[in-house]
């Protein structure tokens, strides 16, 4: 459905990433226009404008449609329809600007699929993980941004200071307590994810709860008072008994499941006698570069690595393809 003028210019005019490598969910092409979030009159005017666009999320899934080329794209609707669906500011989010076009999002919840009701014929809802392989990179980044903010908002309806109700302000990017006036902002949890290497081999581990045969890079949350390098070294030692001797940065990835920033690293370790802790890790395996490439290609029977949407896949590939 082409509900209103939809520039979709990012298909032709992409913002250049600051890093030469860009992970899935990174590269949001919208101008977040954070300076406009406090201007309630401007937001109301844009929300009512025929030129503004709206996107819809329902239980964390995004409304999408077929593009003219046969692929998938966000199903943008008139922003006034999105406002009507929202029932008020509690479920609305100002996403930003594409040139001078304002983009809003609405967060719907409940068991009834809106495409069986008010959104019938306007597209279908798809999970963000599934869309990572079918949406253009800029659009999946927009979906990830909306999903991450809405996940945070759902979990912070009560003030962490006094327990009273909070309400959204600044276009949905802040919540204020109605009682003590405490301010709450979207949460992002930093996670270090590292590929351990020794000589010409890398180490991958697996957890019992993962799909059978899946091996991946090790990861863990950054703790207060730690640097990225210190967190990397701690996680490697705690989970596998390995000591890091050097750490180099690869890239980062916003991960909206629910609110993480994955910090991708490659860590040299002092040996290959890994000892999985049997709590976080149940097994580890070492791979040469050729074996790692085969693992990524699905050529090792009974074993596989995370798919290309995951930063773990990109860490393995970057190391495996080094000269």
Predicted regions span which residues?
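N-terminal strand-loop-strand
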Residues: 175-217, 221, 243-244, 267-269
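Nudix hydrolase/Nudix homology domain
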Residues: 3-156, 167-168, 211-215, 277-323
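A short, glycine/Asx- and small/polar-enriched loop/turn
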Residues: 257-263
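Cys/His-rich short segments
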Residues: 145-195
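The catalytic Nudix box helix
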Residues: 217-251, 265, 271-273
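Short proline/glycine-enriched turn/loop segments at secondary-structure junctions
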Residues: 253-255, 275-277
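Solvent-exposed residues in well-ordered beta-strands and their adjoining turns
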Residues: 268-270, 287-288
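Generic recognition of flexible, low-complexity loop/linker segments
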Residues: 251-253, 296
